[in-house]
Swiss-Prot record:
This is Elongation factor 4. It catalyses: GTP + H2O = GDP + phosphate + H(+). InterPro entries: EF-4, EFG_III/V, EFG_V-like, EFTu-like_2, G_TR_CS, LepA_C_sf, LepA_CTD, LepA_IV. Its EC number is 3.6.5.n1. Disulfide bonds: none annotated. NCBIfam families: lepA (TIGR01393), small_GTP (TIGR00231). GO terms for cellular component: plasma membrane. It is a peripheral membrane protein. One of its GO terms (molecular function) is GTP binding.
Amino acid sequence: MKNIRNFSIIAHIDHGKSTLSDRIIQICGGLSDREMEAQVLDSMDLERERGITIKAQSVTLDFKASDGETYQLNFIDTPGHVDFSYEVSRSLAACEGALLVVDAGQGVEAQTLANCYTAMEMDLEVVPVLNKIDLPAADPERVAEEIEDIVGIDATDAVRCSAKTGVGVTDVLERLVRDIPPPQGDPDGPLQALIIDSWFDNYLGVVSLVRIKNGTMRKGDKIKVMSTGQTYNADRLGIFTPKQVDRSELKCGEVGWLVCAIKDILGAPVGDTLTSARNPAEKALPGFKKVKPQVYAGLFPVSSDDYESFRDALGKLSLNDASLFYEPESSSALGFGFRCGFLGLLHMEIIQERLEREYDLDLITTAPTVVYEVETTAKETIYVDSPSKLPPLNNIYELREPIAECHMLLPQAYLGNVITLCIEKRGVQTNMVYHGNQVALTYEIPMAEVVLDFFDRLKSTSRGYASLDYNFKRFQASDMVRVDVLINNERVDALALITHRDNSQSRGRELVEKMKDLIPRQQFDIAIQAAIGTHIIARSTVKQLRKNVLAKCYGGDISRKKKLLQKQKEGKKRMKQIGNVELPQEAFLAILHVGKDNK
C-alpha cells in the first residue's frame, strides 16, 4: 500500500490538464505509441469537438521512480468548467492529493481557486505545477508569486513543465511520489468501497468506478450496496490503463471498475458505499453533497412516440451524471415531456446534445428558468421552477429570487467594463481586492441573470481574460412578474417567462417582435401579444396571405368587386375561428436569445 498514490489533476479551463494526462500515460507506458492520441481520456465525441473535459476519467499506471521503487499511480483527470465542478469534488473524494496545474502565461484564474479550495477543504496535499513554460509569454516567476498571493500555497519550488513538449513531466511525477501521502486504510478490515462514478453499458449493465477505502474486493465476492441493502455478485473487476483490464482483486487504496450485472439504473447510486455481504462494514462512508440544480428547462420529444425512449435515455444519462434532475411534465402546446434541472447553461447544452447524439432523439427545449421562492397570501412557501407553476398575481404575498455570489478574477484594465456589466445585470458589489495586476471582484447577482448569458458577456467584455466562479447564496424578495405570450388570444404556456418588472416591457416587446419574424404567415392574421396578468404590454401581427380575388374582373362593376372581397373576408373570418397556428422550434428558442442582440 505504501507505493500507491491516488491523485487528481485540477485546473482552470484550458490550462492543460488533459495534455498533461496524455504525457503521464505516455511516460508510464500505459498505451503504446501507436494507440496514443491527443486527449486520450476525453473519450466522448462531444468532449473532443468542444475541446473540454466533461466527465472525470480514471487511469492506473506504474511508474518507476528514481529511488528504484515502482509506484502505482491512480489518477483522475477532471473537468475545469464551472458547470462541472461537482465532477471535480467527487473525484477529489477518492484521492489523497491533487496536482494544481496553472498556465505559466495566464496565471491564476477563478476556477483554479475554486477547485483548489475544494481540495484543501478535503485535506488533500496540493502540489502546484506550472505548465506551458515553452510559451514565449510564459512568466513562471510572476505566476509562482500569484499562486502564493491569491491561493496562499507555497509555490517557490513549484515544478515547471511543458505538457505539450514533455519537458519536466518526469519531475512532476517524482515530486508527486515524494509529496502526496499513500492511502490510509485497513487491508484486513471489512470491505468499504466508495462509488465515484457509474455509467451504463448495454452489454454489462451498470459499470461502477470504485475506490477501495478498507478491505479487499475479489472477483466472485458477494457485494452489498449499503443504501439499498441489495446484494450482487462481483462478476468482473479491474482497472483502466486507459484500456479496461480485468484483475482478480482490487486491494485497499486502489481505484478500479466493477461490474455486478446490476440492471436497475438506481441499483448503485454514486456516492454510495459497497461492502461485502459476508462481513459487512458497520457504517457507510460519508458520500457526496447532493448538488442542487440551478437552472430548469422543459425538454419535450418532437414526436410523442419517442416519449418512452426519451424516459429511458434520461434514466441512463442521470446514472452517469449525478447532478441531472428530472420529473415528468406536460404542456398543452408541446405534449408530454420532462422538466429537467441542470447546473448551468453549458450543462444543459451538453445534456441536450448527448441525448440527441447518443440516444438519437429529437428534442424541443423551453426557455431555462431558475427556482423562485414564493410566499402565498395563505402564508405558504412554495418553490417554483417553471413559469406555468407560478400562482396568480393576487395570490402572491412575496416573490423571492435566488441570488448568486459571483467571484471574478480579471486584469485591472477591464475593471470598468466588467463593473458596468454587473450593474446592468442588477448586481451589488460586496468586495474588491487588488493582487498585483489582477483584481478579485465579488458581486451578488440574481441567478436568473447569471445563468442566462452572463458568462459569455463577461468573456467578451474582458477579451476572454476574466474568469468566473459562482454559487447560490440566498433568496431575496424582488419585484418579478410573469410575461405570458398569447397567440390569437390563446396563452402558450411553453413561451412564458419570469422577469424583473423593470425589464418586462422591453423583454415582452422584444419577444413579440422575435416571434413575428419566426411564425410563418398563414391564411389569416395572427395576433401575437405579451401580457402581464390581463394587462397587454406589447403586440404585433403576422399579416395574412391573401389571394387576389379581383384578378379575373377586367374593369366591370364596382359592386361585383365588393361582393368578391366581402366573400373573401368572411372566409378568412371563419378560418380564423377554427384555424390553428403551428409554432416552429425556433420560436421556442427565441426566448433564449431575448435580451442578447440589442446590447
